[in-house]
Amino acid sequence: MAAAAEQQQQQQQQGFRPLDEASLVAYIKATPALAARLGGSLDALTIKEVGDGNLNFVYIVLSDAGSVVIKQALPYIRCVGDSWPMTRERAYFEASALQKHRGLCPDHVPEVYHFDRAMSLIGMRYIEPPHIILRKGLIAGVEYPLLAEHMADYMAKTLFFTSLLYNSTTDHKKGVAQYCDNVEMCRLTEQVVFSDPYMLAKYNRCTSPFLDNDAAAVREDAELKLEIAELKSMFIERAQALLHGDLHTGSIMVTPDSTQVIDPEFAFYGPMGYDIGAFLGNLILAYFSQDGHADQANDRKAYKKWILKTIEDSWNLFHKKFVELWNKHKDGNGEAYLPPIYNSSELLCLAQKKYMTSLFHDSLGFGSAKMIRRIVGIAHVEDFESIEDASKRASCERRALNCAKAILKGRRQFESIGQVIVHVQSFDRD
């Protein structure tokens, strides 16, 4: 208790205080950028806490004339408590990444209205209904016809324009330097994605007792450990582009014709395949969860086909858009492939093919790692958790886990996303 009180006193001295609904109103009134967005009278605001995440408080603030979302980072992991401290500086990196990515892809990133570093507080656009979290839409069996197009656009632009394919090494190093201080969030990822699932760890869990042997098999799989070590090293060492850092289906809000990417508090310069893999891997998890949500009225078979098509389209469209950007800017400031060296279309094409093949295999590896950790690690996904029958849930999870292990180990053998889809389908049976 004394330590907690001392920590609270230090935070107040630094200008930080956690806001509740009452103090949030006072804060808004004292902050012109937020007050202007809400307009009119600020004495009749509607405030709703909506944070269902693991780390932060999130409030929707509505007035007769406008709306904002307020997000405040806490100095600990919310889903665990103050026994697991966590830097509040993640709010700075989230605000910075939102602003940078919105500049590159304004159609799919919400606007930041206000950032208060001392308070670890972001005021941003309220992504209004009928937008919902993509994960919830996937659980409900809703099709999003533009999802693949939109996410391919987002990933191609945010990754290409923050890489050495577009930037000079000087500018790239400046970006890396800015985000390297987000080390605590990166270390959290290192722990929960690349370490804990492969050993006995305090916060690991699985659908017990059904998956106890499956979790043990992960911890005892030497080949899997060798592959995950390679991915962990790449995650830590390879500053390829400015990543979102947590691009799962809970970080995307959608309607049938709109896609908005939120929550980049894990942003850092890392391997592009980590973002791509997070998105594709979470779609594969959604695919394997569908049997647990099927009923007599809807067997979900048609929806499962739509998910597979979305996975395939997402990669293929990303590949197309990314290479198009590369070709468009091949004579620009990018220093990875200098025009005097790659001085023929044939040579550039070969370089692009090698680059994209490597990126494809990276994406498969990271996507598989993200799948595994959601089944035998600390933080699971609602896709599976909302399946009430534990035996049925475990059956869905086991298929996903076995699929992920196989893809991770054999990722370099795949030559197309179509081959991956066939492979995924081969695990979709008891």
Swiss-Prot record:
Documented EC number(s): 2.7.1.100
Induction: By sulfur starvation.
Residues involved in ATP binding: 52-56, 71, 125-127, 263-265
InterPro entries given in the database record: Aminoglycoside_PTrfase, Kinase-like_dom_sf, Methylthioribose_kinase
Subunit structure: Homodimer.
Similarity field: Belongs to the methylthioribose kinase family.
Function comment: Catalyzes the phosphorylation of methylthioribose into methylthioribose-1-phosphate.
PANTHER family: METHYLTHIORIBOSE KINASE
Protein name: Methylthioribose kinase 1
Organism: Oryza sativa subsp. japonica
Upper classification of the organism: Eukaryota, Viridiplantae, Streptophyta, Embryophyta, Tracheophyta
Name of the gene: MTK1
